[in-house]
Design a protein with these regions (language model features):
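Topology signature of small-to-medium multi-pass alpha-helical membrane proteins
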Residues: 1-136
Length: 136
């Protein structure tokens, strides 16, 4: 394919990428809400405030990755994939413990993980791969 023509092909963002960005953002928002409720029940005072600050920093990093993915930065989707591949097996025992102590908490955690998996699958579809490979 001619490099001069390549940028015009598939220049608009594929629906799969748009949906992936939406699903990933939803997973972070759902996870943040769950975390705030957990922290509110377990902590108070300075420990609660400090935990909320760390949560906000974590969310900022997550949304930075999502915005970079939406901006067609291939490195962002690869880094996010690597983090998911590393994190998901490590989090699985926690999901089991959460399900035993609270079905609601465990279910929400699993829903967050499923949303992230769906988002990653959408980011690596054929149309998504082509979109990330084309030059801006």
């Amino acid at each position: 394919m001619d490099p001069a023509i390549e940028p015009t092909i598939n220049a608009s963002r594929p629906l799969a990428v748009t949906r992936a960005v939406q699903v990933l953002a939803a997973s972070f928002i759902l996870g943040a809400i769950r975390t705030v409720f957990d922290l509110a029940h377990k902590l108070s005072g300075a420990a609660f405030v400090l935990s909320i600050i760390f949560l906000l920093i974590f969310l900022a990093v997550c949304f930075f990755f999502v915005s970079m993915i939406a901006a067609r930065r291939n490195w962002a989707r690869i880094v996010f994939l690597v983090l998911l591949i590393i994190g998901l097996p490590l989090a699985t025992p926690t999901y089991i413990v959460e399900l035993k102590t609270s079905v609601l908490r465990g279910s929400v955690s699993i829903a967050v993980a499923i949303l992230q998996l769906i988002g990653m699958v959408l980011l690596f579809t054929k149309n998504s791969n082509q979109w990330f490979r084309t030059r801006k």
